[in-house]
Amino acid sequence: MKLICYNQFNQDLFHNGMARAVEHAAALGFDGVEPLDMMPTHRAAPIYEMFDARELRRRLDGNGLCAPCCSWAIRRCDRDADAVLDATYRYIEFAAELGASYLHHTLVLSVTPLPDAPSYEQMLSAVLPTAKKIVKRCEEYGMQCLYEPQGMFFNGIAGVSGLLRAVREEYAGVGVCADLGNSLFVDESPLDVTAALIGDARHVHVKDYLCINPPRADLKGHLSRGGVQLVDCRVGEGDCRLAECLALLKNAGYSGAYSIEIDADDDTTRRAMDFVRQNG
């Protein structure tokens, strides 16, 4: 089992620098890291311009760490295709320098319904040409492109399955990043979604949420499509049924990495790592 430092690594990388980020991940006991940036980035420059991938690879190797998957959050894959592809291709080159096997990327980064939102079929048609070009470039660099349940369109069993079917009409090799919490945004059980997509799972994101219904004004969180409030909590203490999800993956023979996607102090992070080790 490989445990991957996700949120903590990226917070360290952008706030404390490359050396601190790598050393902290190693000190916490992680086996690797998962870089993340957005397109368009909200930072002064994208990650591939701020940090030299070869230097990062050297530091990772020196600390016994790997980078099996790199994540890329595209806000709207259906708009500005040339800009999306230019930035994404450069990120793929960055990921390849790190030796990544997988690129996970979003297509429509939204955890709330879009105003005047098109139908699922309309959005799928809009994102598909750009998505396929990204898959092609990944394959040219020896990487597999992954999609996770995310947002208000390509989420849940039908949302992800429909995307996979459409892309596989031309590129059969795409897979799934099994996020163990995101399907709650469309009111579907992470356990059910993981079970449905488990044969395609190549990478896993671990997080947990409390489901609060009716929502409480004193708690910070997001609202699901059906109005349930989703509040971040410690791994294993929420409503994602993580122990069952991890057991399901283990029993299915999943042998990939588990990426810890939480914002937490070191003790809470270590407890999350222990939870995954004990249940996965």
Model-derived segments and spans:
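Histidine-acidic metal/acid-base catalytic patches
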Residues: 1-7, 11, 15-29, 61, ...
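The substrate-binding groove and active-site-proximal loops of carbohydrate-active enzymes
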Residues: 73-82, 234-236
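Residue-level detector of anion-binding/catalytic polar loops
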Residues: 31-32, 66, 101, 144, ...
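Glycine-rich, proline-tolerant flexible connector loops at the mouths of alpha/beta enzymes
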Residues: 34-60, 110-113
